[in-house]
Amino acid sequence: MGFELDRFDGEVDPDLKCALCHKVLEDPLTTPCGHVFCAGCVLPWVVQEGSCPSRCRGRLSAKELNHVLPLKRLILKLDIKCAHAARGCGRVVKLQDLPEHLERCDFAPARCRHAGCGQLLLRRDVEAHMRDACDARPVGRCQEGCGLPLTHGEQRAGGHCCARALRAHNGALQARLGALHKALKKEALRAGKREKSLLAQLAAAQLELQMTALRYQKKFTEYSARLDSLSRCVAAPPGGGEETKSLTLVLHRDSGSLGFNIIGGRPCVDNQDGSSSEGIFVSKIVDSGPAAKEGGLQIHDRIIEVNGKDLSRATHDQAVEAFKTAKEPIVVQVLRRTPRTKMFTPASESQLVDTGTQTDITFEHIMALTKISSPSPPVLGPYLLPEEHPSSHEYYDPNDYMGDIHQDMDREELELEEVGLYRMNSQDKLGLTVCYRTDDEDDIGIYISEIDPNSIAAKDGRIREGDRIIQINGIEVQNREEAVALLTSEENKNFSLLIARPELQLDEGWMDDDRNDFLDDLHMDMLEEQHHQAMQFTASVLQQKKHEEDGGTTDTATILSNQHEKDSGVGRTDESTRNDESSEQENNGEDATASSNPLAGQRKLTCSQDTLGSGDLPFSNESFISADCTDVDYLGIPEDECERFRELLELKCQVQSTSPYSLYYPSSPLDAAGKGDPESVDKELELLNEELRSIELECLSIVRAHKMQQLKEQYRESWMLHHSGFRNYNTSVDVRRHELSDITELPEKSDKDSSSAYNTGESCRSTPLTLEISPDNSLRRVAEGSSEGATANMEAYRPSPKNLLAITEDPEVSTPNYNPGAKELDPSQALEIKERRVSDGSRSPTASPKLGSAYLPSYHHSPYKHAHIPAHAQHYQSYMHLIQQKSAVEYAQSQMSLVSMCKDLNSSNSAEPRMEWKVKIRSDGTRYITKRPVRDRLLRERALKIREERSGLTTDDDAMSEMKMGRYWSKEERKQHLVKAKEQRRRREFMMQSRLDCLKEQQASDDRKEMNILELSHKKMMKKRNKKIFDNWMTIQELLTHGTKSPDGTRVYNSFLSVTTV
């Protein structure tokens, strides 16, 4: 509606008037025909009539009306009187300023704000009325007891009735409460309707999203299947882990259907480009259909022909038409991919040399590895191998090999393959059983342990047991939860798996077929080797005695080149340490040794890594049995025993003389059994068993004789030191005799199947699988008990980055190497160094190869005896560790008597002088000898404890442990692990609760006792007891004081202490 005309000051232009209300236009709107009306007048008209009020045209809607802004601004500038002019306001303002004036006009009507008054007044009079004239204004409170406020009218009337006033007040409050409840119900109803509306919208959006996702998932699945098939057929290089074979199948229609779908085909008929490799592929097979029967089609098969019609370059429509018009029986020729069988690779591709540390080789390790030989000399020929696996082992010059060693080490040892699996519905199973670690290790690998024969994965044929899953559907698998979630997802029907496997992985069938034959042959050969090595040790001892009588000196500088370091309990921690300390002197010693003995240069052999990475050892045709050396009572060995050994050795030599390769390959008794009488085999087995018992008796005799000899040598050494100082004299006898103390090794537990050792930073210079050990410790005694010439030349065998494979040995025992310029080593120093080397055992990086390689014939290390061990398995520590354990059980019982003697010998060696001689190195590389205090008894006991706890495992063993390299635990074993873990957790909780209760009792009994430093540190230790490492503030004194003690003083917690002496 418009503004009244009489409110405006002056005349108003008629064009500014509305034709409907005849007032001044308010919010003018114009019609398409050009007429202008007030918005409040024309909108109801148009909605009701549907035409212009002037009747000038046909139909009209409200959407066709438009605002006239220039006309509106013109009207707003007109002068108008105040709306309260009748009440006395005489203001005249612009129409656009009228709302602002009305808000503060003094003549606007307003009511009194006192309850019960409600009188209508002018805005300017309201304040005065409420203050002075209103009868409802409060003047105080009732003093009669109700406490309600009194109004001016009630006070003027003489008071009020308290009961009536309280009833009125209560009624007012109840009315207000009812109004609030009603408003609350309205708001709740309004909120409920709004919530339902929002939920309906959200459900509709989710439904639409699901439908869209299903549509795109279906398209994506189809496109992915097609892309996978095309990429495998077109882009895949030949020989990439698979091979294709052609099959001819016969199909019969069932109710007019063949039961499979096809995809692919040439894009168009006109495209005759020969380079196009598009083909027809099977994308889906209906369950229980004709194509799904045994011997039928499989997914990803490429169809080549149908009833003689070539479909290799046909379009999709042509392929469909060919199947529709084909007459039964339908003969289909397809191409199917199958996994390529891994064959042997040349030795040049697999000859790798790793570096690592070998520690604590005990008798059980030695006896366990008697069934594992070392590489053979370069006399090639088949030996105990089937014809389908030819033996081709090439040998190269060490210098040529070392030139490419780094490239070989950088070569990738795993091959990756992407496998796509498609399932028809969510109920279909992939058929994969995975295994993983169950402890708190961060690096958890997911491996395939089992494949269901009738599953999708088995039909695909590209996934094998032992493969590691790297990615699933493009997502890198970090832990077992992600792998399980991705593999068990019901939404995905298409799975893309990126798997990894070793390049040299072989089929297990070959190993299973020939394993028993190999083990039988190897067992017989190892028994013979034990006899040979025992006889060599006996002969070397006799020959050494003779050499001592002849007199000779040893180059102590050469002997000590590898012995100048103090035993730290953990071995060297870096390869650079070894290079910095002893590279120059050792190289010079090697050159001098090689030049002084022409035979040594002719016997330089190389190593082959295809059998456990062990190095070849020099072979000498010289006889170790000398008829001249008849003083067999030197170490308490009876003469009849020695004669029996000689007879047995002659018998073995006669047996081996029948083989054309007898110099390098000892003949197997089983081969002889095939040609001769089986009774001779049984007789020889009895002789070999008697040999083992004789060897054990020999070791016990050596121990007893060594104890007696050691006492004599100690007195003689002290006398010679007192009288002759550092003058040159024969030290080779003392050095050799004290090297017999290697029999003092500690026993090792046979159930060591843990996957890691203490990570104390041991060096990594030898392959973890390279164990240069013999059936018993006599092998090491042969190396140390030999003449000084061989000992001095043993420096050439010490592995170095520049000469890992070259071996320079001088087996001559009649020509001692004498260096008059070098400082001689006195007996006490030689004793101490030898004892340190022996106490360090095979923990020293160079102890095992050096001590075990002096006179062992190289034909004892034929790689063909290990044919039952796959080439790829030689890189896995867990595989070899299991083989060692299996072999160790067979010899564990026979070695217990030796172990007990070792403990006695260790106790006898504990009484050492308080001073010892040390070999130091100057800045120019020369060595000198000085006196240093002996380490404290506590440190020695701790070192022995560390040696027991390490038990032959190294940091390399930890890096290549069973779990990380994929040992597969069965379900029963995993259940046992869980039970053990729960039991340990329960014990830890019980111990924790016991300790807390004890601490609470102590605090309650002695609240005001001031805690000393020991109690504080002990409390800190208790918090850390379940952790494998300690914090940065833990001191050795705290560990030694109470590191393994409970609050009551008893030894309860088994915390390990690893100390490195620098």
From Swiss-Prot:
Reactions listed under catalytic activity: S-ubiquitinyl-[E2 ubiquitin-conjugating enzyme]-L-cysteine + [acceptor protein]-L-lysine = [E2 ubiquitin-conjugating enzyme]-L-cysteine + N(6)-ubiquitinyl-[acceptor protein]-L-lysine
GO BP field: neuromuscular junction development; protein ubiquitination
Polar residues: bias regions: 553-562, 593-602, 755-769
Coiled coil: 679-704, 812-1062
A Pfam family it matches: PDZ
Predominant localisation class: other
Gene3D superfamilies membership: 2.30.42.10, Zinc/RING finger domain, C3HC4 (zinc finger)
N-terminal signal peptide: none
The entry's keywords: Coiled coil, Cytoplasm, Metal-binding, Phosphoprotein, Repeat, Synapse, Transferase, Ubl conjugation, Ubl conjugation pathway, Zinc, Zinc-finger
Domain PDZ: 248-338, 418-502
Zinc finger (RING-type) boundaries: 18-56
SUPFAM superfamilies to which the protein is assigned, alphabetical: PDZ domain-like, RING/U-box, TRAF domain-like
Post-translation changes: Auto-ubiquitinated.
InterPro entries named among the record's database cross-references: E3_ubiquitin-PDZ_ligase (IPR051971), PDZ (IPR001478), PDZ_sf (IPR036034), Znf_RING (IPR001841), Znf_RING/FYVE/PHD (IPR013083), Znf_RING_CS (IPR017907), Znf_TRAF (IPR001293)
GO molecular function, one term: ubiquitin-protein transferase activity
Domain comment in the entry: The RING-type zinc finger domain is required for E3 ligase activity.
Protein name: E3 ubiquitin-protein ligase PDZRN3
Gene that this sequence comes from: Pdzrn3
